[in-house]
């Protein structure tokens, strides 16, 4: 019996574990990003694994402003909101955890937007 393995998922999981292990060993506050085909999620998580700030395209404020929530425009807005919420809590330096996704497209747009609004990573 042959088992099907999706190479994309295996590669993403490998990248995820490798990067997360390095970030956790530093004990830094991290900006964790996750994407699906329809939504973007961003969380700021402390070294004790507590969520300090959260933003996603599921929020009614963001959802009402956008026609579609799974594109670069939505990622840019989520990046802006997560940066503002982090700065309100006094967080300016974070480690960027892209959850194994390639630094391209929506992930890059979210990171650039968060940097432009004051987060440093």
From Swiss-Prot:
Keywords: Ribonucleoprotein, Ribosomal protein, RNA-binding, rRNA-binding
Stored Pfam families: Ribosomal_L18p
InterPro entries: Ribosomal_uL18_bac-type, Ribosomal_uL18_bac/euk
Protein origin, superkingdom: Bacteria
Listed GO MF terms: 5S rRNA binding; structural constituent of ribosome
A GO CC annotation given for this chain: cytosolic large ribosomal subunit
GO biological process terms held by the UniProt record: translation
PANTHER family: 39S RIBOSOMAL PROTEIN L18, MITOCHONDRIAL, LARGE RIBOSOMAL SUBUNIT PROTEIN UL18M
Function per UniProt: This is one of the proteins that bind and probably mediate the attachment of the 5S RNA into the large ribosomal subunit, where it forms part of the central protuberance.
Family: Belongs to the universal ribosomal protein uL18 family.
Subunit composition and interactions: Part of the 50S ribosomal subunit; part of the 5S rRNA/L5/L18/L25 subcomplex. Contacts the 5S and 23S rRNAs.
UniProt-recorded name of the protein: Large ribosomal subunit protein uL18
């Amino acid at each position: 019996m042959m088992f099907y393995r999706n190479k994309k998922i295996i590669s993403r999981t490998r990248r995820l574990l490798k990067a997360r292990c390095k970030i956790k060993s530093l004990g830094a506050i991290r900006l964790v990003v996750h994407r699906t085909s329809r939504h973007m999620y961003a969380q700021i998580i402390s070294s004790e694994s507590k969520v300090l700030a959260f933003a996603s395209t599921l929020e009614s404020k963001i959802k009402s402003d956008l026609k579609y929530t799974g594109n670069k425009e939505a990622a840019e807005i989520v990046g802006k909101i997560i940066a503002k919420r982090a700065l309100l809590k006094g967080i300016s330096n974070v480690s960027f955890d892209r959850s194994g996704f390639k630094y391209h497209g929506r992930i890059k747009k979210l990171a650039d937007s968060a940097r432009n609004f004051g987060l440093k990573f």
